Amino acid sequence: MDRVWRAWDGQSFKENQPESPSARGIVVSWLSRAEWEQVTVYLFCDDHKLQQYALNRITVWRSRLGNELPLAVASTADLVRCKLIDAAGTLGTDELRLLYGMALVRFVNLISERKTKCSNLPLKYLAQEVNIPDWIVELRHNLTHKKMPHINECRRGCYFVLNWLQKTYWSRQLEGSLKETWELDEDQLDAEDPEEEEREIIADDVLEEIPEPQDDDKDEELAVEDDANTKGNEEVASHPEPSSRHKELYEKARELLVSYEEEQFKVLEKHRHLLQAIKVWNNLSPRVQCILEELKSISWENRDAVLDAFLDDGFLIPTFEQLAALQIEYEDGQTEVQKGEVTEPNSHKNIDLNEVLVPKPFSQFWQPLLRGLHSQTFTQALLERMFSELSTVGSTGIRPTYILRWTVELIVANTKTGRNARRFSASQWEARKSWRLFNCSATLDWPQVIESCLGSPCWASPQLLQVVFKAMGQVLPDEEQEKLLRVCSIYTQNGENGLAKAIEGSSSSSTGKAPYTLDTLHEDLQPPGTNCESEESIQQKEQGNLKDVKQEEKKENEEEEKEEEEMEEEEEEEEEEKEEEEEEQEQEEHQEEEQEEEEEEENQKVFQDQMEADVEESDDVEEEEEVDDEEEDEDDDYDDDEEEDRMEVGAFSLAQGSSVFENTRTTSRKREALQGSAWQVSSEDVRWGTFPLGRLPGQTEDPAELMLDNYDTMYLLDQPVIEHRLEPQKSKSSTLSLCCGGSNTNSSSSSSSGNMEGLLWNQGQMHGLKAGLQLF
């Protein structure tokens, strides 16, 4: 045992040499005790930045001591680093399993390294000496020799080992007892009895207790089972361990839940207003996060212990003081008492589960913890436990009321969105939207939920089955659902009396149900007033004080329902108005498109008529020019001027029309001729009127975009020479004469021949070229 502790402290020893006071001095790598305490607190907090700072300090310690660093410090640093990498989400599942596995294997190997050098004991026994459970050793064995375990198993082992290290090493340092309890001489430990060693472990309150069976217990077991073999004796001896472990975890879970309630009520006392406290509750504090992580580790090891603690009075089942602190008035919820009417004990049969839900403040109180623990396995186990608890309690009181409410709340909260959720009532739908416990619903095993509900029949089983059928959807056919409902209603028709009879007749029936005889039939046919007068009087007294409270709550609920209905109607009206506006806009757009298409078709027809008329007129003019003589040149010039004007008008109309119906599918000959060339008409819907002349859509300021891709060079000597370019005086005089032709008729007539010789095109041809030229 001493070698194990010395291994953790990273020290060596000599067996036959007594240590002097001066030799007990230890060289440490931290500067002061304050630095050690700071690193201890930072390692086990929930702030990742502080944990990283603590890891950096341990790295500095390792650089100072090297291999002499205490093994507990090194193992803690490795495990905390694995947790930080896991929380960062930068690695995959396989890489995380390798990291966790390496850290856990090193932990188990290091605690047993010094001990295995001196003795050949199995690793399981060495781990039991320091209160490490067998499943940690088995996990190390699987990581080393067998198939890699699941990532959740690795995380569970990491959390447990960190908790073990915190208790057995770091807490001892903070208490200042490391030197007295861990550094014991080998001779002193050999002289001590096992009983004294147990007393020291119990007195420390740091190590997890694993009680060993006493001699008296062993004698009793041997007296009871004289003929049992050694294996049987081992099994009998191991039976008390799980029960004691379960009890220990149960007590620890209760302590954590009490701490959680204290933290939540502190927030409520600080803010006083419930709405502000609910907002703060949703933001988990570091202390609440620590409680949540510890509950997760306990749940991974023993889920039943956590469920038992949750369903104790004072937690999910509130006390009257807790309800008063949360400003919740207790309402039985099983009966609806009206004025002047007598409440019957069996009136809970008419309960409507559509309105049975957990009060919102109480639901928000436990929401952070339930959301953190939420998973398919945990939530389903909690539901099954509530079904079994509901079958054992009565039908009145605060415990059955809140078990039923939590059951309905869990079923509604785990319903997926869609048709299944729409089957719920308005209050349940609002509960799922605003009161739901979880951000995302877990896929529950609904057939298993039905089996649990039918396996624990109670007075509310038919109504609970209906809620389950609504939540799960079409998992079972409607006919099967109806059959199950009928069987359940027949089985639970005796109600409360049948439950009492079943409890009384449990001794005569192995299944816990009393046989149905003629006596029970006569008792059922008797009026309820003969047997239940005392019960009715008690219930009337209990419920007499709650009548006014219930009526006020009913009024408030009715007002809230009216407000909710008005809000829903307003939302529906707004949605209808939006839909109508969208439909009107679509109709207007459709009409505008039709009008534009009609206008485009009309413009096409007009354009084609104009083109045909222009072609016919141009043909007529050419024929007239061929027939006329030279004497009628002046008339021809006049006709040419008229043709030029017409062409200008046609070109102008063409420019206007092209901007309107560029996007239409025209089949004119002009477009067919241009199809495939660089001057073809674009089919894209581009509003050319918004672009200046010479500008293209998407064109930048870089002039290099307008350069040609392919071009040929032509030398100056190869260019054709035109004779009239060598006569600049004639061309100048001809242009001047054209400009001044209207003022002097003699000069125009004398220079007409010179004009025709110097110009390549006349004025009419120039106008035609301009009209036919299209940019882009």
Curated annotation (Swiss-Prot):
InterPro entries from the UniProt entry: Las1
Subcellular localization, as worded in the UniProt entry: Nucleus, Nucleolus; Nucleus, Nucleoplasm; Cytoplasm
A GO MF term: endonuclease activity
Compositional bias ranges of the Acidic residues kind: 185-227, 558-602, 611-646
Low complexity composition-biased segments: 741-755
Stretches the record annotates as Disordered: 185-247, 501-646, 733-759
Biased composition (Basic and acidic residues): 228-247, 544-557
Self-association and partners: Component of some MLL1/MLL complex, at least composed of the core components KMT2A/MLL1, ASH2L, HCFC1/HCF1, WDR5 and RBBP5, as well as the facultative components BACC1, CHD8, E2F6, HSP70, INO80C, KANSL1, LAS1L, MAX, MCRS1, MGA, MYST1/MOF, PELP1, PHF20, PRP31, RING2, RUVB1/TIP49A, RUVB2/TIP49B, SENP3, TAF1, TAF4, TAF6, TAF7, TAF9 and TEX10. Component of the 5FMC complex, at least composed of PELP1, LAS1L, TEX10, WDR18 and SENP3; the complex interacts with methylated CHTOP and ZNF148. Interacts with NOL9 to form an ITS2 pre-rRNA endonuclease-kinase complex.
Function in brief: Required for the synthesis of the 60S ribosomal subunit and maturation of the 28S rRNA. Functions as a component of the Five Friends of Methylated CHTOP (5FMC) complex; the 5FMC complex is recruited to ZNF148 by methylated CHTOP, leading to desumoylation of ZNF148 and subsequent transactivation of ZNF148 target genes. Required for the efficient pre-rRNA processing at both ends of internal transcribed spacer 2 (ITS2).
Similarity-based family: Belongs to the LAS1 family.
Protein's UniProt name: Ribosomal biogenesis protein LAS1L
Record gene name: Las1l
